[in-house]
């Protein structure tokens, strides 16, 4: 359990971390919160990047919004699970 900076942050989950931010809490194991405010991880291996988020599932990264840059325009050679742009429609290889 590690709290690295910020204000009013807490980490009670084993192998969990809160890095910066305000009023963030990790409850379950192997979870992390990176900055933001008013976040809670309540599932094992859950991760939060953003603000005002409570985890909803284990083994999941939770965010408010994602921004993609330089998305491949073909699935050729991509690993399974990779996002690619198919004429303006996002696909998963």
Residues covered by each model-derived region:
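Periodic small-residue-enriched repeat registers in elongated scaffold domains
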Residues: 1-77
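Short, surface-exposed terminal/edge motifs of secreted or surface/virion proteins that either
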Residues: 56-57, 85-93
């Amino acid at each position: 359990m590690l709290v690295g900076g910020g204000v009013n942050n807490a980490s009670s989950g084993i192998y969990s971390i809160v890095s910066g931010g305000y009023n963030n809490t990790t409850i379950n194991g192997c979870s992390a919160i990176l900055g933001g405010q008013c976040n809670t991880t309540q599932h094992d291996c859950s991760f939060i990047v953003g603000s005002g988020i409570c985890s909803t599932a284990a083994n999941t990264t939770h965010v408010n919004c994602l921004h993609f840059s330089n998305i491949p325009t073909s699935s050729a050679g991509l690993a399974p699970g990779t996002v690619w742009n198919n004429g303006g429609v996002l696909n998963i290889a």
